[in-house]
A protein has these predicted regions:
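Short acidic/polar active-site loop segments enriched in Thr and Asp
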Residues: 93-94, 153, 189
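Conserved short acidic donor-positioning loop in nucleotide-sugar-dependent glycosyltransferases
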Residues: 100-103, 163
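Cell-envelope/extracellular polymer assembly enzymes that use nucleotide-activated donors
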Residues: 66-68
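Catalytic-site signature of metal-activated, phosphate-bearing donor transferases
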Residues: 4-49, 137-142, 166-340
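Short hydrophobic alpha-helical runs that function as membrane-insertion/retention elements
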Residues: 94-99, 124
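Active-site-proximal specificity loops/subdomain of glycosyltransferases
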Residues: 104-157, 166, 171
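Short, acidic, metal-binding catalytic loop of nucleotide-sugar glycosyltransferases
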Residues: 85-94
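Active-site beta-to-alpha loop of glycosyltransferases that engages the nucleotide-sugar donor
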Residues: 71-85, 101
């Protein structure tokens, strides 16, 4: 093909084809290469195909999508206010907290009564339920999905020590609705977001400051970053098969990575993907707070404080955090042990 150099022809034909038609034939692309414009086109197409892309995030129309969060918690009064406020700022419509405290234990109403009165937080009575089954946490999750799927478009299943952070788009922070309303998630039944676990940052004791500000150093146990947590659609039409795993919830949903790319994963993906969002996991906090967590047990049962079980907990802490004599002494003093 003879290359036409006429500016008049360029303005009428090429420019019109470039900006008014999506399909650009190969001959025109060859011409554009001559003037260097094709490089920009290739970059734009790559960005569109590989990353979350919003034309103008500042002008996004207020979303009608409703996103809720479900969690189960026990002895978390020191941390529950920060958790609730964090997800309120992210735009979540409601949080369902399954209260797993002992019958005569603390009450979440003592610290978040205002959020309960406003309707943003709803407390579900699971008090004393711990220990009756081997899958208490999953019982709570399945009850939440069954009971409230008609009130939300999506439900996130996170723990109190897990904080979702959504990556900005074009320099603009997104709410959870704005994130999930993006076209890259249209085909997703579940969005799986990787952990990024944090260490004790060489702190020893509880401090009444936000967890997200106190702990900045990453965990030594990098393999744990492969764990994911799920946000699941509520209008799934096919049968949902229970996974009996808090990182998966259901084993037969169409999973996506945090940037919307399809990938069928259940509860673990390594290396982690942080392109769309990340869950910052404050798993141990300080050694003194960790010891309180060990005493508390999990949703299923209280750990027997025998030497074998305590040994497991001791070694896990120092697999995640730097080992120092002072931390070892605190653990031994609290549990009357003699670990080295």
């Amino acid at each position: 093909m003879k290359i036409v150099k006429s500016n008049k022809w360029y303005k009428k034909k090429v420019k019109k084809s470039l900006f008014n038609n999506i399909k650009i034939n190969k001959k025109v692309i060859a011409y554009l290469k001559k003037i260097g414009l094709c490089i920009g086109m290739i970059i734009i197409l790559q960005l569109k195909n590989n990353f979350i892309f919003v034309k103008d995030a500042k002008n996004i129309i207020k979303s009608q999508t409703k996103v809720c969060l479900c969690c189960i918690a026990k002895k978390e009064n020191l941390y529950i206010s920060e958790f609730v406020n964090h997800y309120k700022k992210l735009g979540y419509n409601r949080i369902y907290i399954y209260d797993n405290n002992d019958i005569d234990g603390e009450h979440f109403e003592e610290v978040i009564q205002q959020e309960i009165n406003s309707g943003f937080t709803k407390i579900m009575n699971f008090r004393g339920y711990r220990g009756k089954r081997d899958d208490t946490q999953m019982d709570a999750y399945y009850d939440c999905y069954r009971r409230y799927n008609s009130e939300c478009n999506w439900i996130s299943f996170f723990d109190i020590d897990e904080f979702l952070f959504i990556n900005p788009v074009n320099g603009t922070n997104l709410t959870i609705q704005e994130m999930l309303d993006q076209p890259v998630y249209d085909h997703c039944e579940s969005v799986k977001i990787n952990w990024k676990s944090f260490s004790d940052s060489e702190l020893l004791y509880y401090d009444n400051k936000p967890v997200t500000e106190r702990f900045k150093q990453l965990s030594k146990f990098g393999y744990e970053f492969g764990n994911v947590k799920s946000t699941i659609r509520t209008n799934i039409s096919h049968y949902l098969r229970k996974a009996f795993n808090p990182h998966a919830i259901f084993s037969n949903v169409k999973g996506c990575l945090s940037d919307g790319r399809r990938k069928q994963i259940d509860f673990f993906m390594f290396p982690p993907n942080y392109k769309g969002a990340v869950i910052k996991h404050y798993v141990t906090k300080t050694i003194s707070e960790y010891c309180n967590k060990v005493k508390r047990g999990n949703a299923e049962k209280t750990f027997k404080l025998d030497p074998a079980k305590l040994g497991e907990r001791f070694h896990y802490f120092f697999m995640t955090n730097k080992k120092t004599k002072e931390k070892v002494n605190i653990f031994n003093r609290i549990f009357n042990t003699s670990f080295k």
